[in-house]
Amino acid sequence: MSSRYRVEYNLKVHKKDAFIEWIKGLLAVPFVLQAGTDSGAERTYKQYCSIFSDIENLVSQKIEIQNRRRQLGSLEEARLDQLVPQVGTFFTHLPLVEAFEVQNRRRAICSRKMVSPSFNDIRHILNSAQILALLKSKELKLVTFDGDVTLYEDGGSIERGGKIVTRIITLLKRGINVGVVTAAGYDDPDKYKERLYGLCFALFSDKSMSLEQKSKLTVMGGESNYLFQYFETSEQFGFKSIDDDEWVPSSVKAWSDDDIDATLDVAQTCFGELSHLLALPSKCQIIRKKRAVGFVPGFIFDDELEVNVKIKIPREALEEMVLVVQKKLESYPPAQNIQFSCFDGGSDVWCDIGGKDLGVSILQNFYQTDSPITAAQTLHIGDQFAPKGSANDFKARSAGCTLWISSPRETIEVLDDLLPYL
């Protein structure tokens, strides 16, 4: 296996994004022409800045046209939409030149002679630009997080003393609403207390914070199906369920149970058929919940180690299952009457009713019922932003600003960029 193959394939962890790939192509030209020359780094820096300045202007133009289309019904098309048809909605201007300068100091992008600006370089630049934009606006009111691979490792939890704990508490102390929008779907609030125990314990132990500040922490479980809010008494702490009448939108209340059950039935049948077709181990299981169905790895006995070990489902099989189920449901009439989300969780596959766009939107309304928090005042941090199919954070792009991270360590890094200036 060649090194290039390994590098390109490993990028599938973040699934290629059309906007990032387009920027990557623009930056490749000055890199090829200038790298290795006597004045290469300086000239490359100037050309990169010029490119990012042009992209900045294209984003600003797109926002202006978005506003005209919304307010005046204009049919005008932005130049950026013509160049990158898959590009989504922008809610803030992006200071890309300033963000590039930040990341160039950290990653020495212009000093490299053999490796051109990569997918991850550009991802970090876009993250920095979004942070800078929110800081300049001074309007950030809601920060939402994915769970696995964002706040903690896949299948893990927030431990006592974890680095992420102090960062989230700082957000709460500064009056920012914080929501954990996770695919983990439990109707029992104690399950979320277990996953977020280190954070809950720290909140309970912090006597300098008011209960009002602490109650700004919520959990949206099953992407958009269960809402819980932090609470404490003199002896207890954890999460309490919020009554459906206080947060479930009327549009969601209109979904019929028959359509929901039929959609999950089809997904469940597909998982079963694909399990046989892809020759996956019989120990793998299909789990059916009230508003979700998943295909998860089981355990198999390792004769050499003499212990049960978790089955590893091949990445290709996970992606195949997601895309097949997604395509099947897109043409299934009952599924068109509701919202659903199919995604690859890294070691398993799920089909949920609802989606993270809906989950974030619900929190925007829950925190400010009379005047909902806007997309430009919202920041969602997650690790799954693939443009289609296998990533559930992607939908959150339509509900607010986003940061694309790849690990809990990166979550801490972006919060460290944000918090000192809030």
UniProtKB/Swiss-Prot annotation:
Q: Where is the active site?
A: 146 (nucleophile), 148 (proton donor)
Record's catalysed reaction(s) = IMP + H2O = inosine + phosphate
**Keyword Cell membrane assigned:** no
Indicate how activity is controlled: Allosterically activated by ATP. ATP binding is a prerequisite to magnesium and substrate binding. ATP binds to 2 of the subunits in the homotetramer inducing a closure of these 2 subunits and the release of the C-terminal loop, thereby activating the enzyme.
Instruction: Cite the EC number.
Output: 3.1.3.99
Q: Which UniProt keywords apply?
A: ATP-binding, Hydrolase, Magnesium, Metal-binding, Nucleotide metabolism, Nucleotide-binding
Q: Does the keyword Cytoplasm apply?
A: no
UniProt-listed Pfam families: ISN1
Q: Where along the chain is IMP bound?
A: 146, 148, 154, 182, 348, 356
Q: Name one GO biological process term.
A: nicotinamide riboside biosynthetic process
For molecular function, the Gene Ontology terms on record are: ATP binding; IMP 5'-nucleotidase activity; magnesium ion binding
Which residues are ATP-binding? Answer: 106, 124
> What are the required cofactors?
Mg(2+)
Residue pairs linked by disulfide bridges in the UniProt entry: none
Q: Which residues bind Mg(2+) per the record?
A: 146, 148, 383
Q: Tell me which family the UniProt entry assigns to this protein.
A: Belongs to the ISN1 family.
Cite the record's note on assembly: Homotetramer.
The protein's role, per its UniProt record: IMP-specific 5'-nucleotidase involved in IMP (inositol monophosphate) degradation.
Record protein name field: IMP-specific 5'-nucleotidase 1
